[in-house]
Design a protein with these regions (language model features):
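Conserved Rossmann-fold NAD(P)-dependent oxidoreductase catalytic core, especially the SDR/UDP-sugar
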Residues: 81, 91, 96, 100-162
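Glycine-rich "substrate-gating" loop/helix at the edge of Rossmann-like oxidoreductase active sites
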Residues: 162-164, 200-210, 229-241
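Glycine/proline-rich active-site loop of Rossmann-fold NAD(P)-dependent oxidoreductases
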Residues: 183-186, 199-215, 249-259
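NAD(P)H-binding glycine-rich loop region in Rossmannoid oxidoreductase-like domains
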Residues: 36-41, 47-103, 113
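Alpha-helical substrate-binding/gating segment
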Residues: 218-258
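Active-site Tyr-X1-5-Lys
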Residues: 152-189
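N-terminal Rossmann NAD(P)H-binding glycine-rich loop of SDR-like oxidoreductase domains
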Residues: 2-32
Length: 259
C-alpha cells in the first residue's frame, strides 16, 4: 500500500507538481499551508478530498512550527520539505531569506525527531545555487559535483537578495546534513538540487497575472512586443515535472543520503 507523504510548502510551484504526481500514484498526501484559505483552495484544486489533507503552518520560523502537524499524522512515513522563501526583491535578506530557510529546516527535523519516529525518508528541496561558485558561472572549467558548496558566507549574503537566496539554500542544506550527522536519526536523507526550474503551472487555476519567479521569466518573454528589446539571459534549466519526479524517485528508489 502506498505510503502517506507530508509535503511542506504545498502551495509552491514545485510542490504542486509533486503532490499532483503523488496523488496520481495513489499516495495519501498531507500538505502544509500558511492559512486555511490556501488549504481549502488546494483541496479544490487537487480534487482529491479523500487523498489530500492540509495542516496550517503560518510561519517556518517559530520553534515547534511543525510539531502539531506531525503529531496529528502518525501515518506519514515520508517527508518532502519543499518550503523555503524565494524573494529576490527582499529588503532584509537575513530576515526574509536566511533565517526562515535555516530555521524552517531545523524545525522540520526536530519535529520529525520528536513526533515522527515512523518517518523513514526525508527529501529536501535544495538548489544548485547551494553548490556553484557564482564568480565562475561563465567559466567552462567550473565543475559542480555532489561535494561542491558555494563560497558565500553569511555576511556576503547580505550584499543582495540573489546572494541571500544562494546562502539560504547552502545554510539550510548544511543544517540538514549536520542534523543527520549529529543525531543519527531513523530516517535517511535525500537532497534535490535542481538548476533553474521552468515549466507550466500544475493546474490552470494557478495561472495568474504574475507567476512564481522562474516561470515569470518565460512569461515576461511571451508578453514582449515586436518593438521590445530582448533581455540577455542564459542559464541551465530543468522542467518542473522532472524535478517533481526526482523528489518521488528519491524515496521510491531509495537514493539514501545523497544529493
Amino acid at each position: 500500500m502506498p505510503a502517506s507523504v507530508f509535503v511542506s510548502g504545498a502551495t509552491g510551484f514545485i510542490a504542486q507538481h509533486i503532490i499532483k504526481l503523488l496523488l496520481s500514484k495513489g499516495y495519501k498526501v498531507v500538505g502544509s499551508v500558511r492559512s486555511s484559505e490556501k488549504g481549502k483552495h488546494l483541496v479544490n484544486t487537487f480534487g482529491a478530498k479523500d487523498a489530500f489533507t492540509y495542516e496550517v503552518v503560518p510561519s517556518l520560523e517559530p520553534e515547534g512550527a511543525f510539531d502539531s502537524a506531525l503529531r496529528k499524522h502518525p501515518e506519514v512515513t515520508v517527508f518532502l520539505h519543499t518550503a523555503s522563501p524565494v524573494n529576490l526583491a527582499a529588503e532584509d535578506v537575513e530576515k526574509e531569506l536566511l533565517k526562515p530557510a535555516v530555521k524552517g529546516t531545523k524545525n522540520v527535523f526536530r519535529a520529525i525527531k520528536h513526533y515522527g519516529p515512523q518517518i523513514k525518508h526525508v527529501v529536501v528541496t535544495s538548489s544548485v545555487a547551494a553548490q556553484f561558485d557564482y564568480s565562475r558561472m561563465q567559466d567552462p572549467t567550473h565543475n559542480v559535483s555532489e561535494d561542491s558548496w558555494n563560497s558565500i558566507t553569511w555576511a556576503d549574503s547580505k550584499v543582495n537578495p540573489f546572494f541571500g537566496y544562494m546562502a539560504s539554500k547552502k545554510f539550510a542544506e548544511k543544517a540538514a546534513w549536520e542534523f543527520v550527522e549529529q543525531e543519527k536519526p531513523n530516517f535517511v536523507l535525500s537532497l534535490i538540487n535542481p538548476v533553474y526550474v521552468l515549466g507550466p503551472q500544475a493546474y490552470d487555476t494557478e495561472v495568474k497575472a504574475e507567476l512564481n519567479f522562474t516561470a515569470e521569466t518565460v512569461n515576461k518573454l511571451l508578453l514582449l512586443t515586436p518593438e521590445s528589446e530582448l533581455p540577455e539571459f542564459d542559464t541551465p534549466f530543468v522542467d518542473v515535472r522532472d524535478v517533481a519526479r526526482a523528489h518521488v524517485a528519491a524515496f521510491e528508489e531509495k537514493f539514501e543520503n545523497q544529493r
